[in-house]
UniProtKB/Swiss-Prot annotation:
SUPFAM superfamilies: Ribosomal protein L20. Keywords: Ribonucleoprotein, Ribosomal protein, RNA-binding, rRNA-binding. The keyword Ribosomal protein applies. PANTHER family: 39S RIBOSOMAL PROTEIN L20. GO terms for cellular component: ribonucleoprotein complex; ribosome. It comes from the Bacteria. Binds directly to 23S ribosomal RNA and is necessary for the in vitro assembly process of the 50S ribosomal subunit. It is not involved in the protein synthesizing functions of that subunit. Belongs to the bacterial ribosomal protein bL20 family. InterPro entries: Ribosomal_bL20 (IPR005813), RIBOSOMAL_L20_CS (IPR049946), Ribosomal_protein_bL20_C (IPR035566). The keyword 4Fe-4S does not apply. It comes from Buchnera aphidicola subsp. Cinara cedri (strain Cc). This is Large ribosomal subunit protein bL20. One of its GO terms (biological process) is ribosomal large subunit assembly.
Amino acid sequence: MARVKRGVIAHARHKKVIKLAKGYYGARSRVYRVANQAVIKSGQYSYRDRRNKKRDFRKLWIIRINAAVKNYNLSYSKFIYGLKLSSININRKILSEIAIFDKISFKKLVDYSKNALSI
C-alpha cells in the first residue's frame, strides 16, 4: 500500500484559515491553532449578530418614531394604534425615515392617528 502524504492539503487548509484571520491581533492572525479558534468564534458571532441586527434596527426605528411623536404630545403606542385604526399600513422603518426627512408628511400621519383615536 502506498504511503499517503498530506502536507499539501494541510498547508492549503492552514493557509485558508490564516487568510480568514487576516487583520486579527497578534497570534490570532499568524498561528494556525489560535487563528482557527478565532475564525470559528467569529463565525459564531456573525451568525448570532445577523439575527440581532434585525432586533436592533427595529428598536432604533421605534425609538426614533417615539422621539418624533413626543413633539406632538402623543406616545408611540397610541400613535401606532391610531394608524392601525385609520388603516394606514406603513412599517416602522419607513415611519422613522418620514419622521426624520419629511416633517410635514409625518405631521399629517400624526393628525390621522389623533383623529382615529379622537383626541
